[in-house]
Amino acid sequence: MANTTGRVPLWLIGTVAGILVIGLVGIFFYGSYSGLGSSL
C-alpha cells in the first residue's frame, strides 16, 4: 500500500470527493430551505 509515489493516494481522492459532495449537497439543501434554491 506504500507504493503510491508519484500518484495521489486513492483514500485521499475519496476523502476530498466525499467532503465536496457533502458540502455541495449541504449548501444546496440549505439554500433551498432558505428560499435561495432557485438562484443556484
UniProtKB/Swiss-Prot annotation:
The chain crosses the membrane at residues 10-30. It is a single-pass membrane protein. It is found in: Plastid, Chloroplast thylakoid membrane. Its main location: plastid. GO terms for biological process: photosynthesis. The keyword Chloroplast applies. Keywords: Chloroplast, Membrane, Photosynthesis, Photosystem II, Plastid, Reaction center, Thylakoid, Transmembrane, Transmembrane helix. It comes from the Eukaryota. InterPro entries: PSII_PsbJ (IPR002682), PSII_PsbJ_sf (IPR037267). PSII is composed of 1 copy each of membrane proteins PsbA, PsbB, PsbC, PsbD, PsbE, PsbF, PsbH, PsbI, PsbJ, PsbK, PsbL, PsbM, PsbT, PsbX, PsbY, PsbZ, Psb30/Ycf12, at least 3 peripheral proteins of the oxygen-evolving complex and a large number of cofactors. It forms dimeric complexes. Belongs to the PsbJ family. This is Photosystem II reaction center protein J. It comes from Marchantia polymorpha.
